[in-house]
């Protein structure tokens, strides 16, 4: 292990998780942050982070206790330290400021692409698969082209049981069985309103020797 960094989720209310982290460059990453719901008001976004601007926890001289959660600040785990005030626990910005005051800079996410707005903007009817659980993000051409893969949960929404009798419930979208889908995205063709300032077009140079892609 050469590095360990903190990343702040962007919406406490959305109960988001990180399903994928893909490399854009040597120290820039694309983070897939999402909820698990389907609909036009859901949270599915890709954020660009730069580890060069964040604190490597392995470089700290703080006490470390695996039984207490790892790196300690004032005798508390990082989670415990951030949660010791209601303001920091409920607001990611306050939490980041609390950590910076302790000498730790989390990786800051800059919006790269709002997947929800892109999908529903392209088809407001909802007939296009909404990609409720984006769990795979393939990056090519320095981030100009993305392929998103959706987890279908094996086509199962859940199960129910009465006594020893179990029944599996089929996962559906728009009344049809969900089998999972992939979404190819050409970022150069995505309207500006769906992108954020985290999208920086890479520099592409093509010569007789081949193609070189430089990521800022």
PLM regions and their residue ranges:
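Sequence/structural signature of beta-propeller domains
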Residues: 1-216
């Amino acid at each position: 292990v050469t590095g360990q960094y903190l990343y702040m989720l962007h919406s406490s209310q959305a109960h988001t998780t990180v399903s994928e982290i893909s490399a854009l460059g040597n120290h820039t990453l694309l983070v897939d942050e999402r909820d698990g719901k389907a609909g036009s008001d859901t949270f599915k976004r890709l954020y660009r982070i730069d580890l060069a601007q964040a604190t490597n926890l392995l470089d700290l001289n703080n006490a470390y206790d695996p039984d207490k959660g790892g790196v300690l600040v004032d005798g508390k785990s990082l989670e415990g330290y951030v949660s010791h005030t209601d303001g920091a626990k409920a607001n990611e910005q306050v939490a980041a400021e609390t950590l910076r005051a302790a000498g730790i800079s989390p990786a800051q996410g800059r919006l790269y692409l709002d997947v929800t707005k892109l999908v529903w903007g392209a088809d407001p009817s909802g007939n296009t698969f909404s990609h409720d659980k984006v769990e795979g993000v393939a990056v090519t051409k320095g981030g100009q082209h993305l392929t998103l893969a959706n987890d279908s949960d094996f086509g199962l929404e859940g199960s129910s049981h009465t006594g020893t009798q179990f029944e599996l419930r089929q996962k559906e979208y728009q009344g049809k069985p969900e089998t999972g889908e992939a979404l190819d995205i050409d970022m150069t063709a995505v309207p500006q309103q769906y992108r954020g300032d985290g999208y920086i077009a890479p520099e592409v140079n093509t010569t007789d020797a081949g193609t070189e892609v430089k990521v800022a």
